[in-house]
Amino acid sequence: MTYRVKLVFKAAVWVASLWPLGVLVRAWFTDDLTANPIDYITRKLGHTVLVLLLASLSMTPLRILFRWSWPIQLRRLLGLLAFFYACLHFAVWIGLDHFFGWGRMWKDVLKRPFITVGVLAFVLLIPLAATSTQGMIKRVGGANWRRLHALVYAAGGLGVLHFLWLAKKGRPGPYYFAIVLAVLLGLRLWDWGRKKLAPTRPSPKKRTRLPGVGEGGVVGAAFRPEQRKPRGEGRVK
């Protein structure tokens, strides 16, 4: 992928990802947030979190199935945008829904299961976003980083469960998210099993790599940064 094409893809991701936020801001200023504005904002932000998180998790399966390299360039960006919307979703719940009533929020977390799993999903996303840079991968260590980022599927599962419990009966939307997540996890497990069963080829020289998605197991790594080539590589001298 050339530098210009990469910029186009990333610009498209930014525009598509920030579009829901723009819709909410416009609705706020035009007083078009329905009869229950807080509920509308909360649901819109939560829906966007799941869309972006599943989009990020789908990048590696796309590479596995179609041998495309470009999805990997967008994986980390999509994951961080999902975390951004999760922060907004959580902030609205704290500030607008509960008006910083910490005691009432704590009671809701303990007594209402859909809130419990939603908070757990958000908490799991925090260390993933915090360790999404190349520098943090080196500091944490490859094996530890892979184990940590396996939590992305747990966060996705809890997020889908949060949506399933919250949604009204008869609405198929949450089930679509659950199916997509199950398919993505199944593809990663299939790829992991395929590599485990493949015969190992003796290599004349052992190579060391930075850990990445598709290298070393079923790790989702929605927040995995792209590997950059050093300057001058590939140039004809």
Regions found by a protein language model. Give the residues of each.
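Membrane-embedded alpha-helical bundles that constitute the cytochrome b-like, heme-associated redox core
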Residues: M1-F223, R228, G234-K237
